Every structure is written in structure tokens, then in C-alpha cells.
Amino acid sequence: GLWEKIKEKASELVSGIVEGVK
């Protein structure tokens, strides 16, 4: 569903930010 896609994109975004901070 749409919510699953939103959560998936949010997880990718958070992961990208975390990797950028490291």
C-alpha cells in the first residue's frame, strides 16, 4: 500500500542521513 511505500522511502532517507553522519 501507499503507507508501506512511504515508510520504505523514509527508512531509505534515514539510512542515507545516518551514513552521511558517519
From Swiss-Prot:
Official protein name in the record: Caerin-3.2
Taxonomic superkingdom: Eukaryota
Tissue: Expressed by the skin parotoid and/or rostral glands.
Keyword check for Lipoprotein: no
Compartment(s) where it occurs, according to its Swiss-Prot or TrEMBL record: Secreted
A biological-process GO annotation: defense response to bacterium
Lineage: Eukaryota, Metazoa, Chordata, Craniata, Vertebrata
Alphabetized UniProt keyword annotations: Amidation, Amphibian defense peptide, Antibiotic, Antimicrobial, Secreted
Modified residues (Lysine amide): 22
